[in-house]
Structure formats: C-alpha cells, structure tokens
C-alpha cells in the first residue's frame, strides 16, 4: 500500500481534535474510561507521527516535506497549507511524546475529568498545528486558538491564585498576538502579490526599514512565549498555579513555540533584520541566563524556582540563533528539544512531591529523600540533567551554543569574550541553586509535622515510567547527539547560510553612507 501522498500532517492534527469532540458522549462515571480513551488517542497519534517521520521524512532535505495545500479563500490566497522541515519535525515529535506522557501524568485528576481530557486533546492537535502550518494567517489562528485550552486548564484546575495567573497569561499572550496579526497582514499585502503563504512571503524583497519594523513586532510577540526578559513575568505565575500535566506542556511545548517562531519567521523570513538585531538577541540571552538564575536563588516556592530556571535556560536559544554559525544555530535547536524534555521531567517531579507533601515551600520540606528512595533518585537525576551534567542533553546543547558563538566571525573578539564570560557565570550559578534545592527537599532534618499529616509514599510504577521515558532521550541525546541533530541540521545550516549572507551586504550598505560605520561590531564573515 503506497502512502507517499497520504495527508499525514492533516491526520495527525485532526485525529486528537476529532477524538476530543467524542469525549463528552463517552459513558463514564468515575473518569477511568475517559482517561484510558485519551491515553489511547495520544499513543495512536504519536505512533502516526513516528510512522510518518520514518516513512516520508528525508534527513538530507532542508526544505519542506510532507507538504499539503488546499484552497480555502482564493481571494487572498488563504490555504490549508502544511509542511514539515528540520525546524518543525523534531518539535512535532516532541509534542506527541510529551503530551502523551502528560495525559498519563494526569491520572490523579478527578475533578471534571471529561472536560480536562477534552482540553488536553484539543491542545495536542493545536500545538502540532502551530509547528506544521505554512500559511501565516492560519498560523495566527492556531496560535490564538491553542491558548484557549491552556487558559481553561489554568483557571479551572490551578491553585488558589489560578484566575490571576490564567488572566495574566492570556493578557500577555493575546497582547503579543496583536503584533503577529499586524506583521502578518503587512507582509501578506506588501508588493504586487497578496498571499499569506510563508514561502511566497519569504521570497518578497522587503526594504530593510520595513524588515526591522516587522522583526521588532515578531520579537515582542514570540518573546512573550519564549519568554524573554522583561516579557517573562507571566511564566512564574502560570507555573506557580498549574497542575503537573499543565506544567509539562507549558515547559515542554509552549515555550518552544516562541523559539520555533523566531527561527521560522525572524531568521527565515527577515534575514537582513535578523543580522541587525542579532547583537540585541545575544544581550537579551545573557540577561535571561543571569537574571533568571539569580532570581531563582531567591525563590522559596518550588514551582517558581524551576520556572525561573526555565527562563534562564532559554537564554541559550537566543545566543545560539544569533551566532551566525552552523553549530550555534544547531545548539539553539537542540537546547529547545533538551529543555522540553528536562523541563517536563522537573515539573512532573514537582507534582509528585506536592501530591505527597501538600506544600511547595522549601522551608516546609526536608528529609523527604530518606522516606522515598525512588523519588530521591528521580529528583537527583532530573536535576543533574538540568544543570547540564556531561552525558546528558543539556550539556551538549549548551556546549554547542558556546562553541558556536565563541568561534563566530560575525562579532569582534572582545564582544565574544565578554558574552561567553557572562554566559559562563549563568552556567556556574545553575548547579548552585539546583543542588541547594535538592538539599532542602531531600536531605537535612526531617519535618515531623509533614510526616505526621501526610503519607510519604514512594513513587508508584506510573510515575517511575514517566520519568524513565523522559530520561531515555535526555541521556541518549547526551551520549549520541546525532540522533537529534541529524533530523534538523540540513535545515538549520540552510538558515544560518541565509542570515550570514545578509551580513556583508548590510555592512556594505552602511559603509556607503557612513565610512566609519560598524554594525554592532559586526564584520563581514568569510563565506
């Protein structure tokens, strides 16, 4: 049976959405049937992703594959246009993997289980759509629609301040989305051809001033989701009130949507503006790394501490994508994949700990590891992964970003040394606050009140399975990075070449107007 032309991406997107529509009519009194139904849907959709990947995806092809395009509104060339390349495919696989585990992590949810799993399956399809659509207006629509289930999950199943956190989340993201809409309309209607097709838009010759305007708009919108300082304040509040499955999706998938969009649109569609903004991204990345690491020190709430750790790690994505080197861009992509796995594992462990201790305050914990040996081992391994221990994915990703930026010929040596030194400070701070966190949770004197009022039961097989499933790719990528980089290197190398080619032309244009001009200490690379 020849399935070469089968609409894989449409099937992968619509299957969980259609399944979600069936959830309300499933006869179920205690939530057991619907949870197994949701898990089955997640597993089947993930299997479809893996099959489509192995049967139809060519690692060496940097261009869009699995392409589908169906006419929707011909007047403005609006199409149901899908495709996957090296930027999309790894994140689609990551989405299927983490969302399926998040459904399994939601086993303890007993309040309105039908509504919960309905929203989880809607998120599943919506998140994959964000990474697959190749029409800019359609991208805006799925970007917005995907926010609705996140808002509802936060506001219904969150903590005491859930409405505040959910409202702040929707205001930040919806406010940023206005910039996406304005930029999308401007790009689509510019020139003689009206089209929202991303490939068509990428081929338009936008003047530099317009590119800078569009780039700034996209940077604000996607900087909210990544997040970038100072647009980050919604994230600690959202994580502070979310449940464990929502944590896994926030850290594992939603933040990656911002990084993906920056690579796809800011780098891929506005390369000249990216060459100008690159030093700004580098500085913002360093600020993310150091500011969030220092702020994490001061947090006594476990969720907020790890939330700031996530913000710090995403700073490496900004530095990597602004490095103008193949290895740096590849490192940025790997950091997104790595953090998706590590962030999901850490926040799942927060949920496991809270289910047993019913507290998130580090001051009220202590000696937990003495009673729960499996939880002790799981916490320790996940934390070592987060601090970029050699042999784990975070180490490889951060090392690639460091090497990529340090060897970049697009910046002056002085600027490179300063940035590498400052980023290294963040790397040193990470194990300090993570190991300190472990000490307060697992070691030290036992909290007798905690033991008297709550049963400190060790991890059950379901929880061990979830963490083990996340650690397999974390360690696998750490030991053999090519298992991940082979998927996307052809695309990221093409993207890097595109922005590198923009640097010499910009420098020449500027020097023609101002002989002493130096574009943020950029110099024309040898290409």
UniProtKB/Swiss-Prot annotation:
Q: Sorted alphabetically, which keywords does the UniProt record give?
A: Membrane, NAD, NADP, Plastoquinone, Quinone, Thylakoid, Translocase, Transmembrane, Transmembrane helix
Q: Which GO terms describe its biological process?
A: ATP synthesis coupled electron transport; electron transport coupled proton transport
This enzyme catalyses: a plastoquinone + NADH + (n+1) H(+)(in) = a plastoquinol + NAD(+) + n H(+)(out); a plastoquinone + NADPH + (n+1) H(+)(in) = a plastoquinol + NADP(+) + n H(+)(out)
Q: Does the keyword S-adenosyl-L-methionine apply?
A: no
Q: What is its EC number?
A: 7.1.1.-
Gene Ontology CC terms: plasma membrane-derived thylakoid membrane
Q: Which domain of life is it from?
A: Bacteria
Family the UniProt entry places it in: Belongs to the complex I subunit 4 family.
Entry protein name: NAD(P)H-quinone oxidoreductase chain 4 1
Species for this entry: Microcystis aeruginosa (strain NIES-843 / IAM M-2473)
The coding gene here is ndhD1
């Amino acid at each position: 049976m020849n399935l070469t032309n089968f609409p894989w991406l449409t099937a992968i997107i619509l299957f969980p959405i259609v399944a979600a529509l069936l959830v309300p009519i499933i006869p179920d009194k205690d939530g057991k049937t619907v949870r197994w139904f949701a898990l089955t849907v997640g597993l089947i959709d993930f299997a479809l992703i893996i099959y489509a990947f192995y049967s139809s995806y060519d690692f060496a092809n940097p261009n869009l594959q699995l392409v589908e395009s169906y006419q929707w509104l011909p007047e403005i060339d609006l199409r149901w246009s899908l495709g996957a390349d090296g930027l999309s495919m790894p994140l689609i696989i990551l989405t299927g993997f983490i969302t399926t585990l998040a459904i399994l992590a939601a086993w303890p949810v007993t309040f309105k289980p039908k509504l919960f799993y309905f929203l989880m399956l809607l998120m599943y399809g919506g998140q994959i759509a964000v990474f697959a659509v190749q029409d800019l207006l359609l991208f805006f629509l799925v970007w917005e629609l995907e926010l609705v289930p996140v808002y509802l999950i936060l506001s219904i199943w969150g903590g005491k301040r859930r409405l505040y956190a959910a409202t702040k989340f929707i205001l930040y993201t919806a406010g940023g989305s206005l910039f996406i809409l304005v930029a999308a309309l401007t790009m689509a209607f510019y020139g003689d051809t009206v089209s929202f097709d991303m490939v068509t838009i990428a081929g338009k010759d936008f003047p530099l001033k317009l590119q800078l305007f569009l780039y700034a708009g996209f940077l604000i919108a996607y900087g909210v989701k990544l997040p970038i300082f100072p647009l980050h304040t919604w994230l600690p509040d959202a994580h502070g009130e979310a449940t464990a499955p929502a944590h896994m999706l926030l850290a594992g998938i939603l933040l990656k949507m911002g990084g993906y969009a920056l690579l796809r649109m800011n780098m891929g569609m506005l390369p000249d503006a990216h060459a100008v903004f690159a030093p700004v991204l580098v500085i913002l990345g360093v600020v993310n790394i150091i500011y969030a690491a220092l702020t994490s020190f001061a947090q006594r709430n476990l969720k907020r501490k790890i939330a700031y750790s996530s913000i710090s790690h995403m700073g490496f994505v900004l530095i990597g994508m602004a490095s103008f080197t193949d290895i740096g861009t590849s490192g940025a992509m790997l950091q997104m994949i790595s953090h998706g796995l590590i962030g999901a594992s850490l926040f799942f462990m927060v949920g496991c700990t809270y289910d047993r201790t019913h507290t998130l305050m580090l001051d009220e914990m202590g000696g937990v590891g003495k009673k729960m040996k499996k939880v002790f081992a799981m916490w320790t391994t996940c934390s070592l992964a987060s601090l970029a221990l050699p042999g784990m994915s975070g180490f490889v990703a951060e090392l690639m970003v460091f090497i990529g930026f340090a060897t970049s010929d697009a910046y002056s040596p002085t600027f490179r040394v300063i940035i590498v030194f400052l980023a290294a400070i963040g790397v040193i701070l990470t194990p300090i606050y993570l190991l300190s966190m472990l000490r307060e949770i697992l070691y030290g004197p036992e909290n007798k009140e905690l033991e008297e009022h709550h049963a400190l039961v060790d991890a059950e097989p379901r929880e061990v399975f979830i963490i083990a499933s996340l650690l397999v790719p974390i360690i696998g990528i750490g030991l053999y990075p090519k298992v991940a980089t082979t998927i996307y290197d052809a695309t990221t190398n093409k993207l890097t070449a595109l922005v590198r080619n923009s640097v010499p032309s910009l420098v020449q244009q500027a020097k023609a107007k101002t002989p002493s001009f130096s574009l943020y200490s950029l110099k024309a690379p040898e290409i």
